[in-house]
From Swiss-Prot:
Domain C2: 1554-1677
Cofactor remark: Ca(2+) or Mg(2+). Mn(2+) cannot be used.
GO annotation (BP), single: exocytosis
Residues with Phosphoserine modification: S60, S108, S259, S327, S338, S628, S1551
Pfam name, any one: PI3K_rbd
Protein name according to UniProt: Phosphatidylinositol 4-phosphate 3-kinase C2 domain-containing subunit alpha
Subcellular location per the Swiss-Prot or TrEMBL entry: Cell membrane; Cytoplasmic vesicle, Clathrin-coated vesicle; Nucleus; Cytoplasm
Biological role: Generates phosphatidylinositol 3-phosphate (PtdIns3P) and phosphatidylinositol 3,4-bisphosphate (PtdIns(3,4)P2) that act as second messengers. Has a role in several intracellular trafficking events. Functions in insulin signaling and secretion. Required for translocation of the glucose transporter SLC2A4/GLUT4 to the plasma membrane and glucose uptake in response to insulin-mediated RHOQ activation.
Cofactor: Ca(2+); Mg(2+)
Domain PIK helical residues, every copy: 859-1035
Listed Basic and acidic residues bias regions: 19-31
Gene: PIK3C2A
Length: 1685
């Protein structure tokens, strides 16, 4: 079990010191009586002395010395004072060497010295050694306590208030050695002890970290000579301090001397009547009490002044003052009592050189800040490595420094299939028209360049083809010469959108290379901080020199003012306020030394001025006037003494703040010995001291706080977490939580892996009685996690951490900000500072890498294993991921790891199965690692996850990943950026890899910049990302930095506009938008700027009139920019503020990777991939897809209930694709893209799907937007999920897929596409799990742990076969298509959107079947119009179409158009909207009972419609000649194709199938494995019935011969369809291959009838001997009229 101390931190051990005699207790009345008597006697003696001396302050120095040595002021006289007189009689010049050495050993010599004021615990000849003792011999690194017999006798205890001689001022023992030993001295404090008003001999060792300057006592010139002589003796040099030590000590001495009359000030150090200042019994701070007691005894002649004035509190306020750097003279120890802190070289930082007068002081504020500002060693090492990396990429290398962007490529299978040839248009300089020709998409770009050059040059042998490039028109992007044309994403998009491929032929010299690095960039040294000024940081800056220097200047100005003016009370208040400002600037850290120093300063300033003047008048040789002006500068001035101590405490805090994050060897060359960690058996321990900077809200809302301390490696705990004690808050300058508790982990340091992390999580217990608590009236809640911080136990040099650390504990509110909240400009996040004290042993502990065995490992043959063992091992190896492995599986895999070399992809599973990563086991693990076959980059990506923290593993993984292409790396860059969080140190192989790729590819550098900039908002890792970003900007070159600066500025401007528009009222938003965009326009007047979304797009100005905003909740902006390339189209993007777009980025990234997987396998699902970029917290930019609308906007054209109708989508596509060829192409695009969307949204668990975040392009491509809910986190409607279906597939989508209301073979194609795409993604299950796992630390609200990945793993069904997965997904399609909940969800959303947009309306309604509007001026006036005839058609349903004969003016031959009854009705309805006050002819819309699509109804409607047209044309010219009527009669492409029908006598097409015949086909998948025959019945098509009605088909099979019909199997029944999809598996088990070769498979398709016998639709008999049962056979089989069982 872990051990936790209850108070001091270390385990208690009995001290061997005898307990000192307790002084007799004195109650309050006795104290008052004694004080009155003492004051009366003192006043009487003073009157006598004053009459004799006459207060002649201008007398000689000798008279003053006599007064100084008078004993009249003491109420008690000690015989030891006689030794002072003897010291004055010594003739220094006549002393021999032996006499000097005798004086050195004289015990009474110390009494001749001037009394010393030990303001702080110090190690010097002039400080009492009662708190110091020699430690016993240490056998361990951190013993539980240092105890042993003291080598010094205990001092006498004086329960008296009277002044004592100098030698006994602080209980100094004159028999103790004058100088301390050169060995380390330990300051010891008690563990648990009651409160004592007299000094104790402590038992807990304590050793100060920093230097401890002292006050040098004032000595006469004679005494100075004497001491100098003594210092030169051999005895002193042998047993005392060396001269070098004396110089160090002298350098610490303040030039502000202590008053020699300090012993005349009475004190009551044994009496403490102030309950506020008394330490608690369970947490006594003896050292601090002794310190306070001694100071107060010198500052107050009247002891009640200190007692009463101490209760006064000075209000703290924020008042900035300019401060001047002053020398300081005192340093305090601000460390925890419970820790041994060894003095290091850092302590010498306090020591400054002597001034010309021979005195010394501590460093000035400027010199200290220069020391603080020095870069730590890890940063310096990182900077050196970046400099080395930069030299590998000289600016002269065109391959790595092209200066322009390369068009990304994607490998695509079956490029040379249909439509393999494309038309290319190339602009060549000197040619007025572009050169156009047709080429094969598989041709390389270099061949295309040669074809283009043939138009320019006759002889290509004289031309350097390699010096030419093809630039994309409208973009600053160049095709890659060594890749085929069709592999470029730009060419693929042009083919997808069916747009012209326009390119431009340029030479390298003519190509814009304005992003290339220059010679100046190569010569500029690397500076990690120089270029970060342009980055907005959402957190408080680390301490820098200039702000703190200003605060220090202000502090010293206030100090100087306080020491000079008469009214010191107000001035001291300003000093304290300045101190508070400094502490606030240092993250609210207020050390114990600062707290105590402020208290003493308050007491000192409240002393009566008469007593202070008395002390000052006795000090120097100046007259009264000089004393009055310079008395405040007197070192004996109590205010001066307190200020000196306060100054020292401030400077100690500065050093602590600056050095807490550094390596122990950073500050100075360590002189410690080094010990290897694997030989260290001590347990890990540290002290949690306090948490600083607590907000007032926490104080009111939380009652107690505690910490959970845990050790982790590879993302798992090494030991059970330890909980600290529960404590409340304290208030000084700021609120703080103080534990001062020792935590001991029962794990030896030798067992700690190098990458061990210490995690400290702060919890708060809610104050249930607090009225401000939001849950005060609710059920009591459990503790809340308030924040967390992690710390590596070994630094980048592999030294174990030691000393005090200030750890920034970021609160949960910062890491999980409220979505939609807009951060105010200038807002700086606050952070809690956790002070943790680690032991500082006498040696540095270093982690050394074990020697790796380079001998060849014996690789075992998997085939030598027993069958059951081999099968078990193969089952584990074939699992998709290590996430599903049990403990038993891991142990088994690790045991058999040497059998797995032939399965290299299983390495992550093997390493994840390692039982531990202790030092003793690393050699064998590393040997296995280095001999393992190289992994593919996407497989090695898993080794960058949190499960693999080992530096050797991660470094080797990066080596394997280096084989990845730049375009693949660009796609996966977000995961690599997140993987930086799992690196234990700043300078890692991963950082080097990313920066090296960024140096060679501008697209990677650009994307990496925006990803790192966005990651700065992750406050826990912001410092690391800041360093990497600084390195990227430093090596990227001046031109790239300038471009990124412009992009950042543009984003800031657009963010400001978006916020203003969002906050404006609805009616004023457009005005605010136009005005605010003027400022953005002024930016473009000075700059051209690349688009952050896509740097190849360059904008030169805004098109303000085209800019608008969307009416959704976030009110995003539509920003339209003019392309800088005149051959390019305008640039449209959406800028959104108030929503976190990082989840959208991740979802779109996953969809893009899926699309690339499909393309590599030859499956083009025509996915719409648009770009999305998070440019900051809750803001970002999204690419707008042109010519697209939401499903809601399309559906509500048919009313609010349009989502329940089947035709809206099909009719909308027909409007934009009027010809049959165009509509068929659009329908095909819809089928493919809808299949891709169904698979992608299901696999990723994308929820909150409604008709406002599903969009349709006019070309038929469907795509999804707004990915706020994913991984199965559904949007709730009360207690119900709004997303009830697996994915969105509605009847109107099925209508487009089928081409009508009934299922067709097109729906079977859709199902096959879905299943094929699903199975291809399933094969990459491990990749998607790894990619999502790496994004867990990104802070996305719905991806926080491994548990969130369970949805994806379950959705992909990794353990099933492809056939089983096909059946599974087919059932999902059926479930989604049959879900009425989706349509209700659409309806609810339609109703909800009415409050934003109302019912759809148009000022100029247009006809749904015509995308444009025409006028009679274009087409000519109509002379005659009539309904000529009607025809029956199938498309695929039977319907009637009416032929309208039109004769226009100036035409001889009439024209014909074809319109349905619904289209006539649409014309009438929209004329009623345009002319609501006009009397229009009545429309024949009477209800028809029964079937409408019959000949009799069509004949009647022909007459009625003809009458309607005659009345319409005879109406007013405003109606008859309006554009809507002209558009109705305008011929469409379908009219031109079908016009011949009207001229023929028999106008029939699309005749129905002939009944009575057998027809159709069935698609089967036949396979055999593990003694089982699998027959998957996939589809049947074109079934024929006798009566022409739609059948209810099902499939039945037998294995013949089968006399008893035991082999009968059948599928489910599909209702009312000629083209059913089954995708059902029929299984025959227990048959060998030999048996099956003698069998035949008989398959029959029948129609199930309820009122009659099932009838036969067709069948087929397949001899199984004709099949290769070792592989799957998928084929269509024609149905025949064969007999069946």
């Amino acid at each position: 079990m872990a051990q936790i101390s209850s108070n001091s931190g270390f385990k208690e051990c009995p001290s061997s010191h005898p307990e000192p005699t307790r002084a007799k207790d004195v109650d309050k009345e006795e104290a008052l009586q004694m004080e009155a008597e003492a004051l009366a006697k003192l006043q009487k003696d003073r009157q006598v002395t004053d009459n004799q001396r006459g207060f002649e302050l201008s007398s000689s120095t000798r008279k003053k010395a006599q007064v100084y040595n008078k004993q009249d002021y003491d109420l008690m006289v000690f015989p030891e004072s006689d030794s002072q007189k003897r010291a004055l009689d010594i003739d220094v010049e006549k002393l021999t060497q032996a006499e000097l050495e005798k004086l050195l050993l004289d015990d009474s010599l110390e009494t001749r010295k001037t009394p010393v004021l030990p303001v702080t615990p110090i190690l010097s000849p002039s400080f009492s050694a009662q708190l110091y003792f020699r430690p016993t011999i240490q056998r361990g690194q951190w013993p539980p306590g240092l105890s042993g017999p003291s080598t010094y006798a205990l001092p006498s205890i004086y329960p008296s208030t009277y002044s004592k001689q100098a030698a006994f001022q602080n209980g100094f023992n004159p028999r103790m050695p004058t100088f301390p030993s050169t060995e380390p001295i330990y300051l010891s404090l008690p563990g648990q002890s009651p409160y004592f008003s007299y000094p104790l001999t402590p038992a807990t060792p304590f050793h100060p970290q920093g230097s401890l300057p002292i006050y040098r006592p004032v000595v006469s010139p004679d005494m100075a000579k004497l001491f100098d002589k003594i210092a030169s003796t051999s005895e002193f040099l042998k047993n005392g301090k060396a001269r070098a030590d004396l110089e160090i000590t002298d350098s610490k001495v303040s030039n502000l001397q202590v008053s020699p009359k300090s012993e005349d000030i009475s004190k009551f150090d044994w009496l403490d009547l102030d309950p506020l200042s008394k330490p608690k019994v369970d947490n006594v701070e003896v050292l601090d009490h002794e310190e306070e007691k001694n100071v107060s005894s010198l500052l107050a002649k009247d002891p009640w002044d200190a007692v009463l004035l101490e209760e006064r509190s000075t209000a703290n306020c924020h008042l900035e003052r300019k401060m001047n750097g002053k020398s300081l003279s005192v340093a305090t120890v601000t460390r925890s009592q419970s820790l041994n802190i060894r003095t290091t070289q850092l302590a010498k930082a306090h020591i400054s050189q002597k001034d010309p007068n021979g005195t010394s002081s501590l460093p000035t504020g400027s010199s200290l800040l220069q020391e603080v500002e020095v870069q730590n060693e890890e940063m310096a090492a990182f900077s050196r490595s970046i400099t080395k990396l930069k030299t590998k990429f000289p600016y002269t290398n065109h391959h790595t420094n092209p200066g322009y962007l390369l068009s990304p490529v994607t490998a695509q299978r079956n490029i040379c299939g249909e439509n393999a040839s494309v038309k290319v248009s190339i602009d060549i300089e000197g040619f007025q028209l572009p050169v156009t020709f047709t080429c094969d998409v598989s041709s390389t770009v270099e061949i295309i360049i040669m074809q283009a050059l043939c138009w320019v040059h006759d002889d290509l042998n004289q031309v350097d083809v390699g010096s030419y490039v093809l630039k994309v028109c409208g973009q600053e992007e160049v095709l890659q010469n060594n890749h085929c044309l069709g592999s470029h994403e730009h060419i693929q998009n042009c083919r997808k959108w069916d747009t012209e491929i326009r390119l431009q032929l340029l030479t390298f010299s003519a190509m814009c290379q304005n992003l290339a690095r220059t010679a100046e960039d190569d010569e500029t040294p690397v500076d990690l901080n120089k270029h970060l000024y342009q980055i907005e940081k959402p957190y408080k800056e680390a301490m820098t020199r200039h702000p703190v220097e200003e605060l220090l200047d202000s502090y010293h100005n206030q100090v100087e003012l306080a020491l000079q003016i008469e009214n010191q009370h107000r001035a001291v208040d300003q000093v304290i306020k300045a101190v508070r400002k400094i502490c606030s600037a240092l993250d609210g850290v207020e050390t114990l030394a600062i707290t105590e120093s402020v208290k003493k300063l308050k007491r000192a300033v409240n002393l009566p001025r008469s007593k202070t003047a008395d002390v000052a008048s006795l000090f120097g040789g100046e007259d009264t006037s000089k004393s009055s002006t310079r008395g405040s500068l007197n070192p004996e001035n109590p205010v001066q003494v307190s200020i000196n101590q306060l100054t020292a405490a401030i400077y100690d805090l500065l050093r602590l703040h600056a050095n807490s994050g550094r390596s122990p060897t950073d500050c100075a060359q360590s002189s410690k010995s080094v010990k290897e960690a694997w030989t260290t058996t001590e347990q890990l321990q540290f002290t949690i001291f306090a948490a600083h900077g607590i907000s007032s809200n926490w104080v009111s809302n939380y009652e107690k706080y505690y910490l959970i301390c845990s050790l982790s490696h590879n993302g798992k705990d090494l030991f059970k977490p330890i909980q600290s004690k529960k404590v409340g808050t304290y208030k000084n300058f700021f609120y703080l939580i103080k534990w001062d508790e020792l935590i001991i982990f029962p794990i030896q340091i030798s067992q700690l892996p190098l990458e061990s992390l210490l995690h400290l999580t702060l919890f708060g217990i809610l104050n249930q009685s607090s009225g401000s608590s939001p849950d005060s009236n609710k059920q009591r809640k459990g503790p809340e996690a308030l924040g967390k911080v992690s710390l590596p136990l070994f630094d980048f040099k592999r030294f174990l951490t030691c000393g005090t650390k200030l750890l920034y504990l970021w609160t949960s509110s910062h890491t999980n900000s409220v979505p939609g909240a807009v951060t105010k400009k200038g807002y700086v996040m606050e952070r809690i500072v956790l002070q943790v004290d680690f032991p500082s042993p006498a040696f540095d502990i270093i982690y050394t890498t074990p020697q790796v065995d380079r001998s060849i490992i014996q690789q075992h043959n998997l085939e030598t294993l027993e069958n059951d063992v081999k099968g078990k091992l193969l089952d584990i190896l074939h699992k998709d991921s290590s996430l599903g492995l049990s403990k038993e599986d891991k142990a088994f895999l690790w045991e058999k790891r040497y059998y797995c070399f032939k399965h290299p992809n299983c390495l992550p599973k093997i390493l994840a199965s390692a039982p531990n990563w202790k030092w003793v086991n690393l050699a064998k693990t590393y040997s296995l690692l280095h001999q393992w076959p190289a992994l593919y980059p996407l497989i090695a990506l898993e080794l960058l996850d949190s499960k693999f923290a080992d530096q050797e593993v991660r470094s080797l993984a990066v080596t394997w990943i280096e084989a990845i292409s730049d375009d693949e790396l660009t796609d996966l860059l977000p995961q690599f950026v997140q993987a930086l969080k799992y690196e234990i140190y700043l300078n890692s192989s991963l950082v080097q890899f990313l920066l090296s790729r960024a140096l060679g590819n501008i697209q990677i550098a650009h994307n990496l910049y925006w990803l790192l900039k966005d990651a700065l908002h992750d406050v826990q890792f912001s410092t690391r990302y800041e360093h990497v970003l600084g390195a990227l900007l430093s090596v990227g070159g001046k031109r790239l930095r300038e471009e990124l600066r412009k992009q950042t500025k543009l984003v800031q401007l657009l963010g400001g506009v978006a916020e203003k528009v969002r906050q404006a009222s609805g009616s004023a938003r457009q005005v605010v938008l136009q005005r605010s965009m003027e400022r953005v326009q002024s930016f473009f007047q000075k700059n051209k700027c690349r688009l952050p979304l896509k740097p190849s797009l360059v904008a030169k100005e805004l098109s303000i009139k085209s800019c608008s905003f969307f009416s959704s909740n976030a009110v995003p902006l539509k920003v339209t920019m003019v392309n800088a390339d005149p051959m390019g189209e305008e640039i449209n993007v959406m800028f959104k503020v108030g929503e976190d777009l990082r989840q959208d980025m991740l979802a779109l990234q996953m969809i893009k990777i899926m699309d690339k997987i499909w393309l590599k396998e030859g499956l083009d699902l025509r996915m719409v991939i648009f770009k999305c970029l998070s440019t900051g917290r809750d803001r970002g930019m999204v690419e707008l897809v042109p010519a697209s609308d939401t499903l809601r906007k399309i559906q509500v054209e048919y009313g609010v209930t349009g989502s329940f109708k089947d035709k809206p989508l099909a009719e909308w596509l027909r409007k934009y694709n009027p010809s049959e060829e165009e509509y068929e192409k659009a329908s095909e695009n819809f089928i493919y893209s809808c299949a891709g969307c169904c698979v992608a949204t299901y696999v990723l668990g994308i929820c909150d799907r409604h008709n406002d975040n599903i969009m349709l392009r006019s070309t038929g491509h469907m795509f999804h937007i707004d990915f706020g809910k994913f991984l199965g986190h559904a949007q709730m409607f009360g207690t119900f999920k709004r997303d009830r279906a697996p994915f969105v597939l509605t009847s109107d989508m099925a209508y487009v897929i089928n081409g009508g209301e009934k299922p067709t073979i097109r729906f079977q194609l859709f199902v096959d596409l879905c299943c094929q795409a699903y199975n291809l993604i399933r094969k990459q299950t491990n990749l998607f799990l790894n990619l999502l796992s790496l994004m867990i630390p990104s802070g996305l609200p719905e991806l926080t742990s491994i548990q969130d990945l369970k949805y994806v793993r379950d959705a992909l069904q990794p353990q099933t076969t492809d056939a089983e997965a096909t059946i599974f997904f087919t059932r999902l399609i059926e479930s989604s298509l049959g879900s009425i909940a989706t349509k209700f969800n659409f309806l609810i959303h339609n109703l909800a959107q009415l409050r934003f947009s109302g019912l759809p309306s148009n000022d100029e309604p247009i006809l749904s079947f015509s995308p444009k509007t025409y006028s009679f001026k274009q087409d000519g006036r109509i002379k005659e119009v009539s309904v000529f005839t009607y025809h029956k058609k199938y498309n695929p349903d039977k319907h009637y179409i009416y032929v309208v004969r039109i004769l226009r003016e100036g035409q001889i031959e009439p024209s014909f158009v074809f319109r349905t009854f619904d289209e006539f009705q649409e014309l009438h309805n929209k004329l009623s909207i345009i002319f609501p006050l006009w009397k229009l002819p009545g429309f024949p819309n009477r209800m028809v009972l029964g079937r409408t699509h019959i000949k009799d109804v069509a004949a009647k409607r022909k007459i009625e419609l003809n009458s309607y047209l005659q009345s319409l044309m005879n109406a007013s010219t405003d109606v008859a000649e309006c554009d809507l009527v002209c558009t109705f009669f305008h011929p469409l492409l379908r009219d031109e194709k079908a016009e011949g029908i009207a001229r023929s006598a028999d106008a029939g097409s699309f005749s129905p199938p002939t009944p009575g015949q057998i027809g159709g086909a069935v698609k089967l998948s036949i396979s055999y494995r593990n003694g089982t025959l699998f027959i998957m019945v996939m589809h049947t098509k074109d079934l024929v019935t006798e009566d022409g009605a739609d059948p209810n088909p099902y499939v039945k099979t037998y294995l013949l011969p089968d006399n008893h019909k035991t082999s009968k199997r059948k599928t489910k029944i599909s209702r009312k369809t000629r083209n059913p999809t089954f995708n059902e598996m029929l299984v025959y088990s227990g048959y060998s291959k030999e048996t099956l070769r003698q069998r035949e498979l008989q398959l029959s398709v029948l129609s199930a009838e309820s009122l009659r016998e099932n009838f036969f639709l067709g069948g087929v008999t397949l001899p199984l001997k004709d099949f290769n049962l070792s592989k799957e056979t998928v084929k269509w089989y024609q149905l025949t009229a064969a007999t069946y069982l």
